[in-house]
Amino acid sequence: KGAVDNTSLIVVRDTSGSMGSSATGTTQSCFDIAKALALFFSEMLPKGSFANSWIEFNSVAKMHSWKGSTPYEKWTNDKSKYIGSTNFQSVIKLFCDIKQKGVNESEFPTGILCISDSEFNPTQLNSTNVKAALFSLRNAGFSKDYVNNFKIVLWNLQSNHHGSTTGKKFETFGNVKNVFYFSGYDGSTVAFLTGSDQH
């Protein structure tokens, strides 16, 4: 109940060291909750180069495909661990690298759903991670239309890894088009971004 039919947002899952901390209000780790949400949303990606996929990022980003025929098998076959820093820009670099390998822009997700405790590495020249990401996409040859409509959903799993201020940073100054902030544990809350009906 409350699930979306499909989404063109690919899940970007933070597996940095701080994700091993408990998520606020639960006995579960941010790592496990992010894994569950990643599995939930990747089931809804349309067919194509990114179907059944998710992106892991810590100090670097990697593309993964779930292995198995059931959610349980996919969960148990995922051997990722929490380690390293939270290099959000490595996700954008991965997008750019894939494009350079010849994948057509029309096959790319229209945005990312980043599940993290939001302790991103700082960017250079005091730019926000969002601004730096869009700049990199443009430089990699993505069309103006693609970049201007690229959605960045930052889903914060509040932890206390660095104390009470963990995950309370914003990556924008004021309202920015196609950038959304969420928190919590119910995947249906992003249905309005997908154009899908809820059930």
Task: Show which residues each predicted segment covers.
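Acidic, glycine-rich A-domain
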Residues: K1-H199
